[in-house]
Every structure is written in C-alpha cells, then in structure tokens.
Amino acid sequence: MRPVATRRSKAIGRARISRGIAPLALAAALPLALGAQSTDTLLSALKLPSRAGFAPLVPPPPGRPVLLRPDRVFDATSEETHTGWAVLVEGDSIAAVGPAAAVRAPSDAETIALPGLTLLPGLIDAHSHLFLHPYNETVWNDQVLKEPEGYRMVEAVLHARNTLMQGFTTLRDLGTEGAGFADVAIKRAIDEGLIPGPRLAVATRAIVATSSYGPGPRGFRPDLELPQGGQAVSGIPQVLAAVREQAGRGADWIKVYADYGRGPGGEAVPTFSQDELDALVSEAHSAGRPVSAHATTPEGMRRAILAGVNTIEHGFGGTDSLFHTMAVHGIAYLPTLTAVEAYAEYFDHYVPGKNEPTASMREAAHALELAMKNGVTIGCGSDVGVFTHGTNARELEWLVRDGMRPAQALLAATAVDARIMRMDKEIGRIVRGLKADLVAVGGDPTKDISVVAHVRFVMKNGVIYRAP
C-alpha cells in the first residue's frame, strides 16, 4: 500500500545504515549492486567489524548435530507449550523433539542450553515489502520515482537481514513497488547463501489496473512517462500476458489490486471487472500460482472472492456475509493491523498509548472480529515496509489486542502462515522431518505475546544466525 509523508532527513538515513549490524549486511549487498569481486576484500577495505557475533555473509553448511535445551517448547501443533522438552537438529532438519529424557543425541552433538527461553518455530510474515521503507522517512512516490533500483536493492538486503535476526525466517513478499523483478534476485541470493535473510515467496510487480495505482497519473503532467509501482494492465489479454510474464520471471504468487483509491475524491473503488479478475485467477492457477488480492472495499472483496483468490489482504470493509463466504471457500485473511497503526501515526497524529484508536484502526479491529466469528483462516501478515523492517512482531501484538489469544497469534505466525503459503510440509511447526527453522524468545509468549519481540536465538535451515 502507498500514501504520503515527509522526505527523510540525512540524519535519519545515516541512522538506518549505521544501526546495529547493518553495515555488515551492506557489505554483503554491495558486491551484488556494484559488481565488487570479493566480499572479504570489501569488508577489509571498509574496515567493518569482524564476523564474530554476526549473521554470516555466506552461511556455512550445518555442522555437527545440535541439541537445544530451552525451558519450554511451543511446537505449533496446538496452543500448548511443553516444559522440559528438547529438540535435536541434524543437518538442516529437525531430527527429534519431545521430553528431554526421550531425545537421544549423538555423542558428537553440541548442546545449547536456552534457560528462561521458549523455543518456537521460525516466525512467518505473510505480507511484507522488502523494497519499501517507512513513509515517514520517504514518501512512497519518492521511493518509486527517485530511488535507483540498485539503491533499493541494497536497502532490501539490509531489510532481509534485520528481519531474519528478529526471528522471522520466512516472508511472503507481496510486490517490489516499482523495483521490477528484483525480489527474484534477492530470493536467489538468499537461497544460494550470498546474503543472510528469510526464505522468500515473491510476487514480483503486482498487477494493477491502468491509471489506478501510481505514481500518478493524477497530479502529474500528462506527457510524463512515470515509473509505476505495479504492472498496469487493461482487458483480459493484458491481464493474461501479465500473469504469464510474472510466472515466467519467477513469481511464486500473483498479487492483484482488486480495488484502490481511484475514486473521484481518492476513495477506494474496484479497479478490475469481474471478467478480468476471473481470467487472472484462472490463468494464475493454471500456472500453479496462488493469488493474493489487495481488497479493502466490500465490492472489491466480493469480486476477488467470486474470482477464487487464495488470500485477501487488508479486508477492512469486509462484512459478515463476505467473511462467511471466505470461510466456506477456504480463502485466508491477512489483516495487516500494524500498517493501519503506522498510517495513523504518520497521518492522523495517533500516539500509541495516549490517543484513542482512530476510525481506521477501529474498522480494522472490527474486520478481524468478523473474520474470527465466521471461522476464516487468519494468518499473520503485517505489511512491513510501511513500518520498520525487523519489527514484524508488532503484528502478533495487534492480533492479540484485537481479539486473539496469544497462542492463536503464535499459530497464525507459524503453522497457519505455513499452510497459507503451501509450505507446511517444510516449515511452521517443530516436528521431526521439517526444516530446522527455530527461534527462542525470553519468557512465555503464550502468556505475554510481547516477548516475541525479545529474540535471543535464531536458526534457519540448521544454521545458527543468533545465539544468546
């Protein structure tokens, strides 16, 4: 999603680059963006910190077996936690899990004690934008119009690394917002071990109706050819061509904007006809790609649901009957509550803990309430990029504030998201045979969801990226 804000200051820009261990991730990104031949040479030339204590630039292959001994395990097969359990990791997979006395580790296993911590499956955010950064730093239009793609690629590398280090080991990235197919390159770089980051499912450009998204054309000279935040199409032939191009270039998901702010006063209205949406979904499904629909209005949601999309993003205008239909047809819902809070902070002077929730925040909370009432599958998708990467855990806190039990929110960000993303045979639970994506947080998040922000241990594919 896109709106308005103020140009960030140079001081803010410097803070974003220098914070934490971002410089190391920047060094990892520069060979990709600038053509440097040796990352190690670049590290030396820039006099960056040694690798000790940081996510490896090139993750090593998993070493000897690792036995993890936390205080408790939330395995995401239910809402229960298990005290006194242990988890054995061999290679990139979970080899055993259960009561510590029953988990027998090989003699050469490394034992890692995690006292006071709860071990969770790696967290998942099913609605992210790695190529965006908060709109109170740079307006969306300026990000698309003024930031070169190479610059945005470097930023995305930083965002990916920061996200992983905060326990989110998987993202569904729903559109590069003007950076073309660069998400496919980031995904490849992560998969091949060139840079640290979450495993990605990508949607490339997102499909939008002609003159409905932006930048412009309203407010700009009509003779200007403006870069676009999505792939603009009109009519069934162009819709089909866009789906085929995106699938061919590496999209795992097809994202469509079923409505957007193209009304006379800038209000959200439907952007595609029913026939166009039907054709888009049919072609995507024929290509084996599920479809994500941005939809905030009742009519936009209705058309997307009738077309058979797989997920609805935002859904703030959803009605009781629409959510009932979603439940009947197995269409999942990603509420993106944190983005609503961020918009309120940027544009409505909302101050967390001081002001009453805005009308938009109340509308989003009501939509979640209706979705829960109707038994809709609800995942955790935050729209991060609208707000700061690495703070994705805010979405779990909002899910709880707006009605979920803490354990429900944990399931949404693990097993449920994995199922929505069709990756539940690989990730999302702490079960023998699944990938060793594991995160440990201080305290018990089934009692206090806020502790998911206090990440102490991160493992992805059996590789430790963060240790106490």
Where are these regions (language model features)?
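Histidine-rich, glycine-flanked metal-binding segment
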Residues: 48-53, 58-64, 73, 79-120
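Acidic, glycine-enriched loop/beta-strand segments at the rims
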Residues: 54-58, 73-86, 99-100, 405-410, ...
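Metal-associated gating/positioning segment near the N- to mid-region
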Residues: 117-194, 210, 275, 299, ...
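Active-site gating loops and adjacent loop-to-helix segments of metal-dependent hydrolytic enzymes
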Residues: 131-152, 210-227, 263-270, 328-361
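Histidine/acidic-residue-rich catalytic or RNA/ligand-binding cores of hydrolases
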Residues: 134-136, 183, 212-213, 264-265, ...
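His/Asp/Glu-enriched, well-ordered alpha-helical/loop segment
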Residues: 142-144, 286, 290, 360-445
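Divalent metal-dependent hydrolysis catalytic cores, especially in the metallo-beta-lactamase
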Residues: 155-182, 197-206, 251-262, 290, ...
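Histidine/acidic residue-rich metal-binding segments in metalloenzymes
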Residues: 185, 238-332, 359-377
